Regions:
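An aromatic- and glycine-enriched ligand-binding surface/loop that stacks and positions planar moieties
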Residues: 1, 47, 61-77, 101, ...
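Conserved, well-structured interaction surfaces
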Residues: 1-67, 85-121, 287, 336-358, ...
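Inter-helical turn/loop segments and adjacent helix faces that build the functional surface
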Residues: 34, 168-177, 376-383
């Protein structure tokens, strides 16, 4: 209901925007340093960060609450660019979807022109965009150098421009009032990819960006090659593992991947498992599969060399289906992605390891480009660039170790925009699984929300597909509601169609 929405962004995002608007009102009057050049540099960076963060929070609001109102119009959210006071008129209508997109772009542009792509120390001379503020390399590095790593920067702003453009061009938001195009979305993603170095910038170790080797060698706020923006690297914990390890590893098994997800991982030869050319064996369902399956999901027979253990979902086994309430899998699978196998949750010998949260991966940017470019120009039309949608998907699949020297299934898909769309969406689903994208992707694509959730059971001799949960969604649920408490308070707010 509109009174209970776990995806609600209204309170937190508008609260953040209020603080940002207050900051922007006062930033010019604050003395950040006794040195005039440092003062100007700090003011520019902090102003740029504030604009970028405001654009980010408006993106979260738009993604969560935009939709077709009860009046039939495609609506966004109310826009506030100045701080509200007790004398402000809070009874503001929702701006159009188009106006919200433009506001996000404007904020991101203000960030982009004030911030470097990344915060790194320079030698020699100050970058040309900042020479009007200082010619002193030391002063530039004090404010815009490596000490500011992981703060909001220019490439983060461009990544949110890409996310906004893909959202706005998506099928759910098609409307005469919406000027977004897939070409705009492709160009926005290409700006990030070009900065990364084109196809050659796709991180070779991006499939397991969370591996102990990568995490343990992160230093001083730097990013792994796959990561555009991340959270801090902690000193050590086992929270994710304790929550998601199977019971045999002393975990609580919270996240249970569905059979639906497992089935979309192709065979190592690149063919889907339902293709006659795949070689898939239902009696040995995990043999010869896409290597990402074993890296992202614990399945029956998964081995963990660090712990000398094999996952066994046989009926009655502690890792079996529904053996222990709230701990055992409901689907026959457990999540493995982002978990460290060198963590021990055994109460007798607990060990912890550092982790970090990936806020934005470069692979997402490549997938955004592939989706948008295919829709705008088709699978193989690069529109003047060195890479097409086809080229990006080929590189991602090759990195994963599927398709061999001749990815015949990819080549077949490249002859059709519709087939390539299906393949791109499939690659997006498995590459970004467990990272918070699927919920939003299904809605912006207007995809089927009522597919039953399937799992698998194993009796020691054969596998049996099981129905875990039936889904019941109405069409109006493609968008999330405006909080009912806000609708009751403000007469100018229009609820999204269908929500009560």
């Amino acid at each position: 209901t509109s009174s209970y929405n776990p995806q609600n962004q209204w309170t937190n995002s508008y609260g953040a925007i209020q603080y940002i608007n207050l900051f922007l009102e006062h930033v010019g009057g604050v003395k950040w340093s006794d040195d005039e050049e440092l003062n100007k540099l700090f003011a520019q960076r902090l102003t740029g960060e504030a604009y970028g963060l405001r654009g980010m929070f408006y993106f979260y609001l738009l993604r969560a609450h935009a939709g077709f109102g009860a009046n039939g119009e495609l609506l966004g959210v109310p826009i506030f660019t100045e701080p509200q006071t007790i004398e402000s008129d809070f009874n503001q209508p929702r701006a159009s979807f188009q106006a919200c997109v433009e506001q996000i772009y404007n904020d991101l542009s203000e960030a982009e022109k004030r911030l470097p792509y990344e915060y790194e120390d320079v030698s020699g001379s100050v970058p040309s965009d900042f020479q009007s503020l200082t010619q002193d390399v030391g002063k530039y590095n004090t404010v815009m150098g490596a000490k500011a790593r992981q703060l909001y920067n220019g490439i983060i702003a461009r990544a949110f421009r890409t996310r906004t453009a893909v959202l706005a061009a998506s099928p759910f938001f098609e409307d005469a009032s919406n000027a977004a195009t897939w070409a705009d979305a492709a160009n926005a993603a290409a700006a990030v990819i070009d900065y990364k170095g084109g196809l050659s910038g796709l991180a070779s170790d991006g499939v397991e960006y969370y591996s102990p080797t990568i995490i343990n060698t992160i230093k001083d706020g730097a990013n792994p090659n796959e990561i555009l923006w991340r959270g801090n690297k902690g000193s050590g914990d086992n929270d994710q593992e304790s929550q998601n390890f199977p019971p045999s590893l002393y975990g609580n098994g919270y996240m249970n991947p569905s059979q639906n997800l497992v089935d979309i991982f192709p065979m190592a030869n690149g063919y889907p498992i339902n293709d006659a050319a795949s070689g898939y064996d239902a009696n040995n369902p995990y043999a010869g599969r896409d290597p990402r399956l074993g890296k992202y999901i614990f399945y029956n027979g998964s081995t963990i060399s660090e712990k000398s253990i094999t996952i066994n979902i046989n009926e009655g086994n502690q890792d079996g289906v529904n053996v222990t309430e709230n701990r055992s899998t409901r689907t026959g699978y457990y999540m493995r992605k982002r978990l460290r196998m060198d963590v021990n949750c055994n109460p007798a010998s607990i060990s912890k390891q550092p982790h970090y949260t990936p806020r934005i991966r470069y692979t997402e940017m490549y997938l955004n480009y592939a989706e948008a470019a295919n829709e705008a120009w088709g699978p193989k039309n690069a529109n003047g660039r060195d890479y097409s949608a086809y080229d990006v998907i080929k590189a991602i699949r090759k990195r994963a170790g599927i398709g061999g020297t001749n990815d015949a299934y990819l080549e077949a898909c490249a002859a059709s925009k519709d087939k390539m769309r299906e393949l791109i969406r499939n690659e997006r689903r498995l590459e970004l699984c467990f990272e918070g994208f699927r919920f939003w992707d299904l809605r912006r694509w207007k995809a089927d929300l009522n597919e039953p959730v399937y799992g698998i059971s194993w009796n020691g001799n054969s596998y049996q597909k099981i129905t875990v949960e039936e889904r019941s969604y109405e069409d109006y649920m493609y968008c999330c509601p405006i909080p009912n408490s806000e609708i009751l308070k403000y007469s100018n707010l229009i609820q999204n169609k269908g929500w009560k």
